[in-house]
UniProtKB/Swiss-Prot annotation:
Keywords: Antibiotic, Antimicrobial, Fungicide, Immunity, Innate immunity, Secreted. Antimicrobial protein. Has antibacterial activity against the Gram-positive bacteria M.luteus (MIC=86.6 uM), L.monocytogenes (MIC=86.6 uM), and S.lutea (MIC=86.6 uM). Lacks antibacterial activity against the Gram-positive bacteria B.circulans and S.aureus, and the Gram-negative bacteria E.coli D31, E.coli ATCC 25922, and S.typhimurium. Has antifungal activity against P.pastoris (MIC=86.6 uM) and P.stipitis (MIC=90.9 uM), but lacks antifungal activity against A.niger, C.albicans, C.albidus, C.fructus, C.wickerhamii, F.oxysporum, S.cerevisiae, S.pombe, T.harzianum, and Z.marxianus. GO terms for biological process: defense response to fungus; defense response to Gram-positive bacterium; innate immune response; killing of cells of another organism. One of its GO terms (cellular component) is extracellular space. Hemolymph. It is found in: Secreted. This is Anionic antimicrobial peptide 2. The lineage of its organism: Eukaryota, Metazoa, Ecdysozoa, Arthropoda, Hexapoda. It comes from the Eukaryota. Its main location: secreted.
Length: 60
């Protein structure tokens, strides 16, 4: 067993960091609830894709 963080967790962490940066920028630019909803949905969708991909690729 390795002590390093699994790649899929690193991917999720990067995705969260990226999303947070983008989200903060958008909130500063304009508080547009439709835009924020859209961004949240996009984020959830992309996170779901990462998780589904990792499940398929994860060693049994």
């Amino acid at each position: 067993e390795t002590e390093s963080t699994p790649d899929y967790l690193k991917n999720i962490q990067q995705q969260l960091e990226e999303y947070t940066k983008n989200f903060n920028t958008q909130v500063q630019n304009a508080f547009d609830s439709d835009k924020i909803k859209s961004e949240v949905n996009n984020f959830i969708e992309s996170l779901g894709k990462i998780l589904n991909t990792e499940k398929k690729e994860a060693p049994k």
